[in-house]
Every structure is written in structure tokens, then in C-alpha cells.
Amino acid sequence: MYRTKVGLKDRQQLYKLIISQLLYDGYISIANGLINEIKPQSVCAPSEQLLHLIKLGMENDDTAVQYAIGRSDTVAPGTGIDLEFDADVQTMSPEASEYETCYVTSHKGPCRVATYSRDGQLIATGSADASIKILDTERMLAKSAMPIEVMMNETAQQNMENHPVIRTLYDHVDEVTCLAFHPTEQILASGSRDYTLKLFDYSKPSAKRAFKYIQEAEMLRSISFHPSGDFILVGTQHPTLRLYDINTFQCFVSCNPQDQHTDAICSVNYNSSANMYVTGSKDGCIKLWDGVSNRCITTFEKAHDGAEVCSAIFSKNSKYILSSGKDSVAKLWEISTGRTLVRYTGAGLSGRQVHRTQAVFNHTEDYVLLPDERTISLCCWDSRTAERRNLLSLGHNNIVRCIVHSPTNPGFMTCSDDFRARFWYRRSTTD
């Protein structure tokens, strides 16, 4: 059978695949030795693409291998992280240092929580002053692009119609600690230090108060809607995780007490298909749960070397969990094996963080973002290789307590103890 000549570039690609496979399998020192020997031109990410190609080669002829290498759905930049295949993906999305502040909104107290709607059109912010604001992202972008002379000549009616803050909600009596948009309805859920979970119908411009609420026994710390919108997970200061039916407010908990955390729950999140959810706790553990039975599937003990787990979220394909802890490290976990595949280090070099904040993906999952508490800057890493990118100074006058990135476009919101929330966006050259 005729075979094409193997050139230098082919061998370089082979060596990169070998390094990626060694990193994926946990042979870090061997991989580093090979890296030092062959000096690849770009950073290698953990991946088992080589194993898949070998399996194809053993099962089929070499044309199948060539087909696998060239398939558009094997390596698809911008669709999310998948280390089984995308060891050599070229990053297409902008890194954090290219974003700029487009709008700033102020509360009357520290702003410590924010959330995006599923379509990326709305952002809600919550404050220690017990208020909630809902902002329209298109209006924020339009406002930032508006010439100052046009802005100064706006009538009161025009200003109201174009104002980015479309709702301000007041019904809590203490700090708002968590927020979540309903996946299909114009409903916003909020949790507070006042021990209540409240539901707001923001489709009505005059609505300032919640139309439903749940009285909890402890301060709420994190909430997450089931993708159907029929249920909501609630993590509180108490270690027992709750699941509520939002129509009847019936509460469900795991039938096995051993499933539960041993300290306050800091983070709860469903995956996109609702067959799993993940929790992180002050006890230092990450727990993965079955979305149907509400039973704990597995526990990652001392996920951040015993430090408090601040956040835990799923990748788009639900193969990975991105977590952060008070050790100022972000980690990418492979769910099928429970292993840490990638560590994102370098934040907190000037001192270990004191307050909770989150690690997040950008909208394409090409980057991982994590605020640095001491420098008030945003650390950015290549999600596949953990290569550090340029820092972004966040412009706040106090520590950043929350970051949320848009699920659909290059925008994110930062919330700070300086009472402000900043909306950041990376405009394209055609904007």
C-alpha cells in the first residue's frame, strides 16, 4: 500500500501527541523530560488523542486514521474544552487583557454576587444593601458607545427607555448572597443572609417584591435551577443540601446522611442535561451527585489540599469540573476518573486569599479566569495548557468578590466591595 513520506513536521506532531498523552496519564516528569529534549514550538495540553488514533489504527486501516485526524468535529475550536481530542486547538477567542470596561453600576453597599441569564442578554447583581439590579447587556454596550453630547441631550423619557438598569428589586432585609435566572421564564431567584429564597417576576416593570419565597433555617450561600426550571438546588450555611420543587416548595434531601458535606455549602451547579450536579464546601470537598436520585456519586476529598472550595462548575460537555479554592488555585477535574488534569497557578502569589471568589471559563472555554484578591487583577490561563496570559487590572477600589462570564459572547461582570459592578466587553473591530 502506498504511504506518504513522513516529514519533520509529522514527527513533531507525533512527539506532541506523545507528550500530551503522558500528561493526560499523569506521567508529568517523563513528559517534562521529553519536552526539555525535543523543545516543541507550542505548549502541549493533556490529551488522549493519541490513544484514540492508535485504537482506530488497530481496528481499521490507515485511511480511517487520516479521516479521524481531519474530521471537523474532532477538533472544533470555540465549542468548548475536550482534552480527548483538542490537544492542538488554536485559540480563537480574545484573552482577558483585551476586554475593557463598558459600564459601571453602583449599589449602596458592597456588591458581592452576579449572574447571567442563559441567553446572555441580562445580568443581575446583588448587594449587601439588600437590593438587586437587573441590567440589559445590549443597553450597556449602546450606552458606552454613545457620544457624550448625545447623552447630555437625552430627555428624561429617552434616558429611562435607554437606561441599562431595567429593574431594581427590594424584598430582602439583609445581604443578597446568591442569584439565578430561571432557564425559560422571566423569573429571578435570590438567596440572602435573611434566611430566605425569593422568586421575582421581572416581566412586570412595576414589580419590586417577590411573588413567592421559601423560609430557610440558615443563610443561603448558593442556588442553581434545574434546566427544566421546575426545581432549584439550595446550598446554605448548613451542610445538608436541599432540592426544592418551585411549584409546591416541597423539599427533598438525600436519603443517606453520609452523602452530605460536613460544613457549609459554598457552590451548587447543575450540568446542562441535569443528570448531574456538583457541590463545593467549606469542608474542602467537591461532591458529584446523581441528578435523578439525589445521591452522591463520588467525593473529591481535600480537592484544594484541605482549603475551602469556593466554586465548582461543569464544562459544556459535562466531562470536566472547574473548581477554585482558598488556596488561590483553579483546577480542571476529569469526571470519569476523578483526576486533576490541569492546575492553574500563579494567583495569590502576594498572599493567600481570604475571601471567596470564583474560577470561570470564558464563553468558548478557551480560557480560565480567576481574580487575584491582593492585586485586584484578573488572572487568565489557556484552559488546555495552563499557560499564563496577561493580567487585566480590574479598576476596582476594593477586593473583587465575584466574577461571571457571559455564556454567549466576550463579556463578563465583576463585583466588588467598593460597592460597584463593572461590565467588561471585548469589542470586535466591526463594532
Swiss-Prot record:
It is found in: Nucleus. Its main location: nucleus. InterPro entries: CstF1-like (IPR044633), CSTF1_dimer (IPR032028), CSTF1_dimer_sf (IPR038184), WD40/YVTN_repeat-like_dom_sf (IPR015943), WD40_repeat_CS (IPR019775), WD40_repeat_dom_sf (IPR036322), WD40_rpt (IPR001680). Keywords: mRNA processing, Nucleus, Repeat, WD repeat. GO terms for biological process: mRNA 3'-end processing. N-terminus mediates homodimerization. This is Cleavage stimulation factor subunit 1. It comes from Homo sapiens.
